[in-house]
Amino acid sequence: MSSDSSRRIQVPEELKEVLLQFSISFLVEQPPDVIDYAVEYFTKLQSERPSVSHTDQSTDDQLSVNSQDADAEPPVMASSRRKSVFAEAYDPEADDDDDGATAVFPKTDEQRARLVESVKNVLLFRSLEKEQMNQVLDAMFERKVQPGDFIIRQGDDGDNFYVIESGVYKVYINDKHINTYNHTGLFGELALLYNMPRAATVQAETSGLLWAMDRQTFRRILLKSAFRKRKMYEELLNSVPMLKALQNYERMNLADALVSKSYDNGERIIKQGDAADGMYFIEEGTVSVRMDQDDAEVEISQLGKGQYFGELALVTHRPRAASVYATGGVVKLAFLDVKAFERLLGPCMDIMKRNIDDYESQLVKIFGSKNNITDTR
């Protein structure tokens, strides 16, 4: 194959995302055998394919074309220059350092807003929660450049990711000019995960300012946060009596499927009459369960940390029969969508069905009848 034809080969965005997500999962789990873990990971991924929406796939196509130029490794380099992609080991369980030890580099509100806007469509940043994003933004450091400065050189090991604050920068591959950044853009994001040679050279055409993030800091923030969250989820799930019917590995799979959500005081979480899309476990705070009665909402119960709601609509396949509101400050919840619910909570189904009788008895005490409601959630 000629060099011209090889340069036309493009790595599909879907493949990039799958490999990146697998890499993150591998780093978090740190299994003893990468092959066995890969088989298990991709088998599970294949079983979940029907639940993947076209919307998620189309979002991947929105990744900035400019941001890929400096990291999209040409095939001609792959066989001779690729190095170990996980050169630095990091064990989040062994990291006892205080999060406050991470350096914080001051930025104006305007600069932070521009950074958020710049990175919001980068795959690695799309999955960050607000707290993680703030930690990443705090840790990004300033680099001033002068005309002629080389920011990255083709073939060098990748270490930093860059967001352009100001300046003009030219991108070269094999000394051929392929792109120009004009006071905006980003490059080098794959360096946050992979220890691989740079696939392009970026040189400053004018003086300018860059914000940079190094791989070790990013991975520490991301992986330590992910590790802590999983541990927290495991502790939360271990405290739920209903889930005692699950095996340990089933609870671990359940923890991996949970998605964090937060609601402010008074904010509605689910609405009576809506279709059920999942259930919730309460991480922090309290919620109020209310039902419409005579043109007014009547509180049925309050739930707190370690309790759950929303499951009975999934069991009965009926619309939500009550509304749930956050009360007493910010409420943090772990959300399990309906597909994962059906896949993971089969062993608990009998327990949840028995709970229906308890809720109906509660309705009789409050309203004098069940009002034909078989699901108060």
From Swiss-Prot:
GO biological process: adenylate cyclase-activating G protein-coupled receptor signaling pathway; axon guidance; behavioral response to cocaine; behavioral response to ethanol; cellular response to ethanol; circadian rhythm; locomotor rhythm; olfactory behavior
Coiled-coil zones: none
Phosphotyrosine: modified positions: Y90
Post-translational modification: The pseudophosphorylation site binds to the substrate-binding region of the catalytic chain but is not phosphorylated. The physiological significance of phosphorylations by other kinases is unclear.
Biased composition regions of type Polar residues, renumbered to the chain: 48-69
Modification Phosphoserine occurs at: S51, S58, S64, S67, S84
Tissues expressing this chain: Detected in follicle cells, germline-derived cells, germline line stem cells and outer rim of ring canals of nurse cells throughout oogenesis (at protein level).
Region of interest (Disordered), residue spans: 48-78
Record's subcellular location: Cytoplasm; Cell membrane
Keywords: Biological rhythms, cAMP, cAMP-binding, Cell membrane, Cytoplasm, Membrane, Nucleotide-binding, Phosphoprotein, Repeat
Subunit structure: Tetramer, composed of 2 regulatory (R) and 2 catalytic (C) subunits. In the presence of cAMP it dissociates into 2 active monomeric C subunits and an R dimer. Interacts with Akap200.
Known function: Regulatory subunit of the cAMP-dependent protein kinases involved in cAMP signaling in cells. Mediates membrane association by binding to anchoring proteins, such as Akap200. Might play an essential role in the regulation of neuronal activity in the brain.
Protein's recorded name: cAMP-dependent protein kinase type II regulatory subunit
Native species: Drosophila melanogaster (Fruit fly)
